[in-house]
Regions:
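Aromatic (Trp/Tyr) and acidic
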Residues: 1, 6, 18, 33-75, ...
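Carboxylate/His-rich catalytic cores and anion/metal-binding grooves
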Residues: 7-29
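Proline-centered turn/helix-capping motifs that create local helix->coil transitions or kinks
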Residues: 24-34, 107-111, 146-149
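Short, solvent-exposed loop/turn and secondary-structure capping segments
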Residues: 25, 31-35, 78, 114, ...
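N-terminal module-boundary/linker segments of secreted carbohydrate-active enzymes
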Residues: 74-80, 85-91
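Solenoid-like repeat scaffolds
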Residues: 159-167
Length: 338
């Protein structure tokens, strides 16, 4: 739509990535966050005059950005225009710099950022999640550079994933699972490790904890999650569970039951689109795109009461196509509510 020859989704991602690049210091480390110290804010964000402060550099932020930069470098470098390819090279160097900082500072891994001076959420990752984020970063860096250093990292660390420790596939483990699968399908991956990853994933998703719930019709809306998984951001959890079934099909891990996996995945898509207890399409403002009852407003500071993005029918409402958080029986307002 922007007319620059690049998909708009990639333009949006590039805008975010350029901000993340500003968070990286010359050392390769990345600041944990940049935020106001309280819950203040305004809409649109470009009019917000509040002072913002950097948190310190942390291993968790550096690890996460390392993987994001490497993944984005692969995508950007594959575009046909010179600007995207140049940006891809910049992202690759940023990923390499982040990895080099991590290698040079093993004593700072994992990080335990305490959010000192801020009221907003700290968003520190658990040590296990930092480990899995780095595994995924290694998988993308191996694909990007073909350097066996990153292959060896995955080979030596993959069994620490819950996929192997607990024989567990979960929508809460997508960081680890997506990294492992990305590595497993790479032609340069160590064959024994690749085979172990694909077998472990297949055996779990084809079993009672995943396909079994679909076959038993344990959810009348065909989008099963356990009660405890209906929490903050449950629509994301639903979508990732559906993706687990799609991976079984797209990777050909159990071809004899491929129609079942596709049907199971569709259940989660239909749930998002309106086949759910409240009969709502959980995407915002989709009236012009075929939805009869899409979300007319959403709880977000940028689309707050009194703004032109407040509610469809009263004002313009939120932009089309945003996925709202979803059902959450444990919801309680935090400091940003007021």
């Amino acid at each position: 739509e922007s007319g620059n020859g690049v998909p708009d989704a990639l333009d949006e991602v590039a805008w975010e990535l350029k901000w993340l690049l500003k968070m990286q210091s010359p050392s390769g480390a990345v600041a944990h966050k940049l935020s106001v110290t309280d819950w203040s804010g305004t809409s649109p964000p470009s009019t917000d005059p509040g002072a913002r402060y950097f948190a310190p550099d942390t291993a968790s932020a550096t690890i996460s950005c390392c993987g994001a930069f490497a993944h984005a470098a692969i995508v950007s470098s594959a575009q046909g225009d010179p600007a995207s390819q140049t940006f891809g090279a910049q992202l690759q160097q940023a990923a390499l710099d982040a990895w080099a900082w991590l290698d040079a500072n093993p004593g700072l891994i994992p990080s335990y950022y305490n959010n000192q001076g801020f009221s907003s959420v700290a968003c520190e990752d658990l040590p296990y999640d930092q480990d899995m984020n780095r595994l995924r970063a290694a998988a993308y860096l191996f694909e990007l550079t073909s350097d066996v250093v990153y292959r060896d990292w995955v080979d030596q660390s993959h069994t620490r994933a819950h996929l192997f420790q607990w024989s567990w596939v979960s929508p809460w483990e997508d960081v680890a699972q997506s990294g492992l699968l990305r590595y497993a399908i790479h032609p340069g991956a160590t064959a024994s490790v690749s085979g172990a990853i694909l077998t472990a994933y297949r055996d779990e998703v084809s079993g009672v904890d995943h396909l079994g719930h679909f076959q038993a019709v344990d959810d009348p809306y065909r989008a099963y999650l356990s009660d405890g998984d209906h929490s903050w951001g449950s629509n994301r959890t639903k979508a990732l569970q559906g993706e687990a079934f799609m991976r079984m099909d797209t990777l050909g891990l159990d071809p004899g039951q491929a129609p079942l996996y596709r049907a199971a995945a569709r259940g989660y898509l239909h749930y998002i689109h309106g086949v759910n207890p409240v009969g709502l399409c959980f995407l915002t403002h989709m009236d012009a795109h075929g939805a009869e009852r899409s979300m007319r407003e959403t709880y977000h500071l940028w689309f707050a009461d009194g703004t032109i993005w407040d509610r469809v029918g009263v004002t313009f409402g939120p932009p089309p196509g945003y996925l709202v958080g979803g059902v959450n029986p444990n919801y309680a307002p935090d400091g940003s509510y007021n």
